């Protein structure tokens, strides 16, 4: 299964980007052994519309353009379902085994994600009940993707 990340906002050069890239590289190297591969990271500039609803809608249009036809969609949202690392790994395995070829994980902008995306999503997850800066969400999901692969492959990185 090809997994892509979609993010509203660009990750500027610096330690946050370096760490996210490090975990995505690890995922890209180890994922194929368990049938998961990194397809791409798609970034878009945040909408500059006057109100939040319009910004969310404009950002949703960009996300829809980035989606491959028939792909699964997972949204990261502070009101989503919290999973531990093993449950996240199992969710990825379930998606992989579903016969779908593509999965997109979406990180919304400062205003969140459009309700139409929530209605279309295959899962809405949170990385805890706290609100996280965009840069840290990228690092956290990159690390969790790598951790999921190590869980699925039996690698000792994850020691629960």
From Swiss-Prot:
Catalytic activities? pseudouridine(1915) in 23S rRNA + S-adenosyl-L-methionine = N(3)-methylpseudouridine(1915) in 23S rRNA + S-adenosyl-L-homocysteine + H(+)
Q: Which Pfam families match?
A: SPOUT_MTase (PF02590)
The answer to keyword Transferase applying to this record is yes
InterPro entries in the cross-refs: Alpha/beta_knot_MTases, RlmH-like, tRNA_m1G_MTases_N
* Annotated S-adenosyl-L-methionine binding sites: 76, 108, 127-132
UniProt-listed Enzyme Commission number(s): 2.1.1.177
User: Where is the protein localized?
Assistant: Cytoplasm
Q: Name one GO molecular function term.
A: rRNA (pseudouridine-N3-)-methyltransferase activity
> What coarse category fits the chief subcellular location reported for this protein?
cytoplasm
Presence of keyword Acetylation: no
Which keywords are on file for this protein?
Cytoplasm, Methyltransferase, rRNA processing, S-adenosyl-L-methionine, Transferase
Sorted alphabetically, the Gene Ontology cellular component annotations on this record are: cytoplasm
Q: Which domain of life is it from?
A: Bacteria
Alphabetical list of HAMAP family matching this protein = 23SrRNA_methyltr_H
Assembly mode? Homodimer.
Q: Which family does it belong to?
A: Belongs to the RNA methyltransferase RlmH family.
| Cited function | Specifically methylates the pseudouridine at position 1915 (m3Psi1915) in 23S rRNA.
| NCBIfam families recorded | PRK00103.2-3
This protein is called: Ribosomal RNA large subunit methyltransferase H
Q: Which organism is it from?
A: Sinorhizobium medicae (strain WSM419) (Ensifer medicae)
Which gene underlies this protein?
A: rlmH
